[in-house]
Amino acid sequence: LLYREAVDIQGSIFRLTTLMREVTDEVQGHVKIAVASHVICPVFDEALTHFHARHPKATLSIDVDTSREAIAAVTARSASFAICLVKERNPKLEYRRLYREFFGLFCGPSHPLFGKTNLTRRDLAGHSSVSFETDRLHDVLKPVTLMRAAADMGDDIVGTSSHLEEVRRMIIAGIGIGPLPVHVAQRDVDAGLLWHLPPYDKMPEIDVHVVWNPRAKLNRAEESMLQELMGRIETIPIEERTYG
């Protein structure tokens, strides 16, 4: 409890220092965004474009973290907001679903299943896999764990990472079959670097959220950037924010 209070006080001091820098009418504040690795979302990109056009003197920094670290940064008020996966909701934070993605299984060019058609889940049985550190029954990628289990791939995970780019690297290197968001992997599929494996329907849905701390005193740049995102979330149907 004492530690949480100390983190809260430290965050408040950090926020006060940031707010005191804003003494002009023009928005010049800094926005620090914590994102999970490889967030591919046109809605987010459009919000960034519009924000910069409106406030060219405001600055941005985007830190790539695990989803857990991103949420911790928001809790500690050291990040303006986060874009990440959510396992359990903290009642002290606010959450809005930014987009939905679907995960599929992929292999690289040197894998024996690469390039083969008419495959079924049974063809994946016994093959080793690589995955994310959160690909566990008790964690945020539980649906992906169940997808691997349905293919009878077992628990033989020979490589893990918390970053999508490194999971992708291991898949392309032929270390094992691995999960990736379908819309993120499509470019590599088109380039002949990845091969999409079964299942091809009923793939696991994963929601990516915007997370912020309502107790944090945001500067005007942070407020504006958050409003850019919220406005799009409220007006664009989830069907148009679903990728895969």
Where are the regions a protein language model picked out?
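A late-sequence structural motif
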Residues: 43, 195-239, 243-244
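Flexible hinge/capping segments at coil-to-helix
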Residues: 24, 93-132
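A local structural motif
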Residues: 54-62, 148-158, 193
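Short amphipathic alpha-helical coupling segments at ligand-binding clamshell hinges
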Residues: 1-5, 43, 47, 120, ...
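Beta-alpha-beta core module
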Residues: 90-97, 101, 166-215
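Alpha-helical "hinge/linker" immediately C-terminal to small N-terminal DNA-binding modules
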Residues: 1-22, 231-234
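Secondary-structure junction motif
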Residues: 121, 127-152, 218-220, 226, ...
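Central regulatory/effector-binding core of bacterial HTH transcription factors
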Residues: 28-91, 244
